[in-house]
Amino acid sequence: MKLLHIDSSVLAEHSVSRQLTARIVTEWQATHPGTAVEYLDLAQDTPATLSGAELAARMTPADSRSAEQTAAAARTEAFLQQFLAANVIVVGAPMYNFSIPSQLKNWIDCIAQAGRTFKYTETGPVGLAGNKTVIVASSRGGVYSTSEALRALDHQESYLRTVLGFMGIDNVRIVRAEGVNQGADRRSQALAAAEADIATLV
């Protein structure tokens, strides 16, 4: 079994999501001995932002690419193959301005490719990357899960569920720590709740 451990927070050792992903991976290895873990830090190894040039590199036949296009396409392909090879993916996804970090969005733009991880058919899109388990370590400075009005502001967990589902992944588990910027007591409570969830979700 292969597990891909992804962090995307820019806060380094101050990051709650990094703390949670580390705990999740440790628990997974304890309950699934022999799991091979590969680590990807998107804050350090950031995929290129999707652009016209980036898309052209992917779409141009390999034997017609420039040197720059060949390098760009190879980098994108490496991220995609790493994703496809994983049976389990643990993703650290803090909420930034109601959504996800740009580094994580760039990674998603690498792996969400028509004909590779999903396809369009006459009856609608079909995911091609199923049979994976994704565990999302969600951290939030505020609280956004306690009412419909607050949940409407969530373009973090909801987006991840949507895009992963579009690629055929419906086994998405969320470990959430929210309100972590609302004082030391609230932060401690949020982390304790998340730790308890890890024990039941892994």
From Swiss-Prot:
Reactions listed under catalytic activity: 2 a quinone + NADH + H(+) = 2 a 1,4-benzosemiquinone + NAD(+); N,N-dimethyl-1,4-phenylenediamine + anthranilate + 2 NAD(+) = 2-(4-dimethylaminophenyl)diazenylbenzoate + 2 NADH + 2 H(+)
Similarity section: Belongs to the azoreductase type 1 family.
One Gene Ontology term of the molecular function aspect: oxidoreductase activity, acting on NAD(P)H, quinone or similar compound as acceptor
Enzyme class: oxidoreductase
Keywords tagged on the record: Flavoprotein, FMN, NAD, Oxidoreductase
Subunit description: Homodimer.
Cofactor: FMN
Organism: Laribacter hongkongensis (strain HLHK9)
Textual note on the cofactor: Binds 1 FMN per subunit.
Entry function: Quinone reductase that provides resistance to thiol-specific stress caused by electrophilic quinones. Also exhibits azoreductase activity. Catalyzes the reductive cleavage of the azo bond in aromatic azo compounds to the corresponding amines.
PANTHER family linked: FMN-DEPENDENT NADH-AZOREDUCTASE 1 (PTHR43741), FMN-DEPENDENT NADH:QUINONE OXIDOREDUCTASE (PTHR43741:SF4)
EC number: 1.6.5.-, 1.7.1.17
Keyword Transcription regulation appears in the UniProt entry: no
Gene designation per UniProt: azoR
Protein name, as recorded: FMN-dependent NADH:quinone oxidoreductase
UniProt keyword annotation of Flavoprotein present: yes
Residues annotated for FMN binding in this entry: S9, S15, V16, S17, M95, Y96, N97, F98, S139, R140, G141, G142
